[in-house]
């Protein structure tokens, strides 16, 4: 009991390894403990593969140190109680003889929410919610913010990334913007964010001017779905997004809001928007932005204003991250957060 936080923290770290690779499922981690020692651990790696609890049980069996019988399993999300593409996790827990389950976050899926505790209790397994460190609970909840949004609304969790100068400009008078963010901030918000999201969205002008690949070098299999917003549909046929041979599809839509909703129907759980102010504004003004990540560089551009600002007051919780010579603000829309 006293070490619950220690083992739950390990489960959270394991869960993070699955971010961006489990759609439409959530990223979940699990740790099995017996006699105060970890005897098995695992995380959900991809949809259709073992859930975290099953992966941890199999890991314990392979290690052969101790049987899971009578052990405690720590899970970042309430175990599922109904079979899907794989069996229900509560059945695997019961079959392994695990006697105690500690989970961090209730499953937001109405099909499973609250049902694990009742089912496990009938089998003589104690199931309880983790009551420790509030910061740790927030980390566990943040792991499933995209899943929560998608499973309750059918709409992906949308993150908008913008880079700007101290005077609020995202490019100079000639449209140059690549040099605003530092190398450190590009690594943080580029490769890292692309790796943990299911899809990346940009506008047609980004494709025409920058010809980006929009892939993540650190992403396994490069299965990031690329989305281009173009009202006219006129895009260069030789653009990298169409010719680089990546296994994932490049999708073209004429409207950003429509694209987000269609992506949700396709099972896309999270979308990273790397377009400019116009694309960000089109999503914000219809209430589709969940998270803003703004890179603020220590430069003053002094360019002419570029279009109107985003209308409406943003209702956000804000934090700041130092990143090389720049700093990054991370803003979460409060709606829908527990």
Regions found by a protein language model. Name each.
Residues 13-20, 62-65, 122-125, 145, ...:
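Generic secondary-structure signature for well-ordered alpha-helical cores
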Residues 30-31, 51-56, 60, 154-164, ...:
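Short, compositionally biased "basic patch" segments
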Residues 21-22, 48-49, 128-163:
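Proteins enriched for Cys/Gly/acidic motifs involved in redox and nucleic-acid/cofactor modification
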Residues 29, 104, 229:
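The conserved SAM/SAH-binding core of class I Rossmann-like methyltransferase domains
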Residues 93, 140, 144-147, 210, ...:
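Hydrophobic packing residues within well-ordered alpha-helices of enzyme cores
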């Amino acid at each position: 009991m006293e070490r619950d936080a220690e083992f739950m923290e390990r489960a959270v770290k394991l869960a993070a390894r699955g971010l961006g690779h489990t759609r439409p499922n959530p990223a979940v981690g699990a740790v099995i403990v017996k006699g105060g020692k970890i005897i098995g651990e695992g995380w959900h790696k991809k949809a259709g593969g073992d859930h975290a609890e099953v992966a941890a049980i199999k890991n314990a069996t392979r290690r052969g140190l101790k049987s899971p019988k009578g052990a405690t399993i720590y899970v970042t999300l309430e175990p599922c109680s109904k079979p899907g593409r794989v069996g229900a996790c509560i059945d695997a827990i019961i079959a392994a003889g695990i006697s105690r389950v500690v989970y961090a976050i209730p499953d937001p899926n109405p099909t499973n929410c609250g049902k694990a505790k009742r089912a496990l209790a009938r089998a003589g397994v104690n199931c309880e919610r983790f009551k420790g460190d509030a910061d740790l609970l927030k980390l566990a909840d943040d792991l499933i913010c995209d899943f929560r949004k998608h499973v309750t609304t059918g709409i992906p969790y949308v993150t908008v990334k913008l880079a700007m100068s101290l005077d609020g400009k995202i490019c100079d008078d000639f449209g140059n913007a690549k040099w605003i963010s530092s190398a450190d901030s590009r690594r943080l918000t580029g490769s890292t964010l692309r790796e943990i999201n299911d899809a990346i969205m940009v506008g047609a002008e980004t494709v025409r001017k920058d010809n980006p690949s929009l892939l993540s070098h650190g992403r396994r299999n490069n299965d990031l779905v690329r989305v281009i917003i173009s009202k006219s549909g006129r895009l260069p046929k030789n653009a990298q997004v169409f010719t680089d041979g990546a296994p994932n599809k490049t999708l073209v839509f004429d409207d950003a809001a429509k694209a987000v909703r269609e992506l949700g129907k396709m099972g896309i759980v999270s979308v990273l928007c790397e377009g400019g102010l116009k694309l960000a504004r089109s999503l914000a003004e219809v209430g589709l932005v969940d998270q803003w990540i703004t890179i603020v560089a220590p430069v003053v551009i002094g360019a002419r204003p570029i279009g109107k600002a985003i209308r409406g007051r943003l209702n956000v919780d804000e934090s700041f991250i130092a990143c090389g010579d720049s700093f990054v603000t991370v803003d979460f829309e409060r709606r829908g957060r527990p």
